[in-house]
């Protein structure tokens, strides 16, 4: 059920002004956010319906009033830099954009918990560029004012490509990640106001003094849960320690799940954050996109390839021959074998996995995105964050090591408000994860096959080295470890 403050009623003079603080504690100054008169005129019943229909919860630890969601682009605060021009290609803001924008424009720290494909990049990106433009207006020299940290190079490049469209002349935007020329990236950093980066390369550049983070006023931790899963917690702490304190910096965190580890990270880096949850409640560690129809088939391991061929013949023939299909495998050599198998059956297919060099990965993704190759076989390197338009079907040939990864895999379809389909092969070898998978299916109102229920519905207790024992609603396994199996 949507929650709202009793202070959400109309008020055309409403603005969000930070509480007075001592000079040493003050957040970076910026014009106060003033709600537009047009938004102020929207009946309260429409605001209530919007929050309820999108299952939105807003939690604010401060005494400040709850700000009305910006449900139309015409309600955005005035801007003299034509920042909003690219938004003309969209009909309206997504729920996560609508609710977080007012708080971000007001300078508040924000935590956004939302499914994949919900429009998070522009949710943090538009306020980011607006803030940097305000900072640059009062400083003639180049300075790094905003840093966006993300777990993978593919996601870093994707965010960069989206933000370029909103970046006017005078705002340098650099994308830094491993596997590319450091010299080229250093040159880009010299003129950068905004950096999109992976943790490892960002830490490298800070360690060798190629960049200065002392003037950062806007920090984004995108897919924070995934960065912790990948072991970047200490790198992130080292990077953030080089920035101004949380009282002098606006910090934004977006995450698809809300486990204890992410909550502790938020406590460490943020100051009185507003927490916005879309499509669920904070007691749920993970949730699946309800627009995705999930079909789970219990099969024998030796029957996977024949079933895969049958599904491709069903969904990739005739008028559907160019529909995008994303096929997930667990191991690199398995992905290579499946790619060859699919190609041998006459389908156009490409692959992406960790053994491929950067150029090969780019070429595969570009071919898939353009539609020239409609089938892509991937390991989990492609499962998180990549915004590949119009993926009609996700096929899980091998179940991942965690149900979190399952949710992020299937989240490659059903994006930007569209419907999607995900078909998963589940074997006896995966039965330790059956309880977690059942919870995911239940939470999204999906059919649960009897064969899956026979494996059990118990979600086991989980141990974490740092946080002890706790229960996870949708995970039955300990943290995934690297296994040499089919590699």
Swiss-Prot record:
Q: What is the designated name of this protein?
A: ATP-dependent RNA helicase DBP3
Q: Name all Helicase ATP-binding domain ranges.
A: 101-276
> Domain remarks in the entry?
The Q motif is unique to and characteristic of the DEAD box family of RNA helicases and controls ATP binding and hydrolysis.
Q: Where is this motif: Q motif?
A: 71-98
The question of whether Glycoprotein is a record keyword is answered with no
Q: Name one GO molecular function term.
A: RNA helicase activity
Which reaction(s) does the protein catalyse, per the Swiss-Prot or TrEMBL entry? ATP + H2O = ADP + phosphate + H(+)
Q: Which cysteines are joined by disulfide bonds?
A: none
Q: What does this protein do?
A: ATP-dependent RNA helicase required for 60S ribosomal subunit synthesis. Involved in efficient pre-rRNA processing, predominantly at site A3, which is necessary for the normal formation of 25S and 5.8S rRNAs.
What SMART domains does the annotation carry?
Answer: DEXDc, HELICc
Domain of life per record: Eukaryota
Motif DEAD box: positions: 222-225
Q: What is its EC number?
A: 3.6.4.13
| Main subcellular localisation | nucleus
For this UniProt record, the keywords arranged alphabetically read as follows:
ATP-binding, Helicase, Hydrolase, Nucleotide-binding, Nucleus, Ribosome biogenesis, RNA-binding, rRNA processing
Of which family is this protein a member?
Answer: Belongs to the DEAD box helicase family. DDX5/DBP2 subfamily.
Among its keywords, does the record have Hydrolase?
yes
> Which GO biological process annotations does it have?
rRNA processing
Q: Which Pfam families match?
A: DEAD (PF00270), Helicase_C (PF00271)
Location of region: Disordered: 1-40
């Amino acid at each position: 059920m949507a929650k709202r403050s009793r202070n959400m009623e109309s008020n055309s003079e409403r603005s969000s002004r930070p509480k007075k603080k001592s000079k040493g504690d003050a957040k970076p100054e910026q014009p106060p956010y003033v709600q537009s008169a047009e938004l102020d005129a929207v009946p309260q019943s429409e605001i209530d319906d919007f929050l309820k229909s999108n299952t939105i919860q807003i939690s604010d630890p401060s005494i400040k009033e709850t700000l009305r969601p910006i449900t139309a682009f015409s309600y955005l605060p005035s801007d003299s830099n034509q920042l909003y021009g690219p938004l003309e290609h969209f009909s309206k803001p997504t729920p996560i954009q609508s609710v977080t924008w007012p708080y971000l424009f007001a300078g508040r720290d924000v935590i956004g918990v939302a499914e994949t494909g919900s429009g998070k990049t522009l949710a943090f990106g538009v306020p980011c560029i607006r803030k940097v433009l305000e900072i640059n207006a009062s400083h003639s020299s180049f300075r790094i004012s905003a840093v966006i940290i993300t777990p993978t190079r593919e996601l870093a490049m994707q965010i960069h490509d989206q933000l370029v469209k909103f970046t006017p002349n005078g705002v340098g935007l650099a994308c830094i990640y491993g596997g590319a020329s450091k010299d080229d990236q250093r040159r880009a950093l010299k003129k950068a106001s905004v950096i999109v980066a992976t943790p490892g390369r960002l830490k490298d550049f800070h360690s060798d003094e190629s960049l200065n983070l002392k003037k950062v006023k806007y920090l984004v931790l995108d897919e924070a849960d995934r960065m912790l899963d990948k072991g970047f917690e200490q790198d992130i702490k080292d990077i953030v320690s080089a920035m101004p304190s949380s009282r002098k910096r606006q910090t934004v965190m977006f995450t698809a799940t809300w486990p204890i580890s992410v909550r502790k990270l938020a406590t460490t880096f943020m100051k009185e954050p507003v927490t916005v949850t879309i499509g669920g409640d904070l007691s749920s560690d993970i949730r699946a996109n309800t627009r995705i129809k999930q079909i789970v088939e219990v099969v024998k391991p030796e029957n996977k390839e024949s079933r895969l061929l049958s599904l491709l013949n069903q969904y990739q023939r005739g008028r559907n021959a160019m529909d995008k299909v994303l096929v997930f495998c667990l191991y690199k050599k398995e992905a290579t074998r499946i790619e060859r198998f699919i190609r041998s059956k006459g389908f156009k297919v490409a692959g992406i996995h960790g053994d491929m060099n950067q150029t090969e990965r780019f070429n595969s993704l570009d071919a898939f995105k353009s539609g020239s190759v409609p089938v892509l076989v991937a390991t989990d390197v492609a499962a998180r964050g990549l915004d590949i338009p119009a993926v009609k079907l996700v096929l899980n040939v091998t179940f991942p090591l965690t149900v979190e990864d399952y949710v992020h895999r299937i989240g490659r379809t059903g994006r930007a408000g569209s419907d999607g389909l995900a078909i998963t092969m589940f074997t006896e070898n995966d039965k330790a994860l059956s309880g977690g998978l059942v919870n995911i299916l239940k939470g999204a109102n999906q059919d649960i096959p009897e064969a899956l229920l026979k494996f059990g519905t118990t979600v086991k207790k989980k141990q974490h080295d740092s946080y002890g024992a706790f229960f996870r609603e949708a995970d039955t396994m300990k943290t995934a470890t690297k296994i040499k199996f089919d590699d």
